[in-house]
Swiss-Prot record:
Name of this protein: Regenerating islet-derived protein 3-alpha
Domain notes: Lacks the EPN motif and the presence of Gln instead of Glu at amino-acid position 114 may explain its inability to bind peptidoglycan.
Keyword set, alphabetical order: Acute phase, Antimicrobial, Disulfide bond, Inflammatory response, Lectin, Metal-binding, Secreted, Signal, Zinc
A biological process from GO: acute-phase response
InterPro entries reported in the protein's UniProt record: C-type_lectin-like, C-type_lectin-like/link_sf, C-type_lectin/snaclec_domain, C-type_lectin_CS, CTDL_fold
Protein function: Bactericidal C-type lectin. The lack of the EPN motif may explain its inability to bind peptidoglycan. Acts as a hormone in response to different stimuli like anti-inflammatory signals, such as IL17A, or gut microbiome. Secreted by different cell types to activate its receptor EXTL3 and induce cell specific signaling pathways. Induced by IL17A in keratinocytes, regulates keratinocyte proliferation and differentiation after skin injury via activation of EXTL3-PI3K-AKT signaling pathway. In parallel, inhibits skin inflammation through the inhibition of inflammatory cytokines such as IL6 and TNF. In pancreas, is able to permealize beta-cells membrane and stimulate their proliferation.
Organism: Mus musculus
C-type lectin domain mapped to chain residues: 47-172
Encoding gene (name): Reg3a
Amino acid sequence: MLPHLVLNSISWMLLSCLLFVFQVQGEDFQKEVPSPRTSCPMGYKAYRSHCYALVMTPKSWFQADLVCQKRPSGHLVSILSGGEASFVSSLVNGRVDNYQDIWIGLHDPTMGQQPNGGGWEWSNSDVLNYLNWDGDPSSTVNRGHCGSLTASSGFLKWGDYYCDGTLPFVCKFKQ
């Protein structure tokens, strides 16, 4: 039998070797994993894991969403954070001088039947957690049931607009 002291030394040496091997293999694995970068087609801009494009040809809200759906997982843009709102605003500002609104993927399929504007949703089914209304969407002033970005807010805030109106729009899709 090996003395207790020798057995402890061998155990520590074996453990140290195993830890070294796992650490080296882990470093090699990390080097092989490419950093996530979104490469978008010409005319589109990347933000996080999506591609975005401002389409200047005015369409109704429904026609605009159909145009966006021609791309993989494409829809009118859903804006899920303040950072994304700023990105979309920078994409639009200075390029739509003749329009007071542009389409985004918000719509109210209940046509205002839900109290307090509770029927609004994104066309791509993203969860509507981030809210950035330029006023009250349930007011009786406009009563549109499709969402837009408003020029008066620097294209940062949302308004409601008549779905049959024709406006430029922003598409968002995964590449």
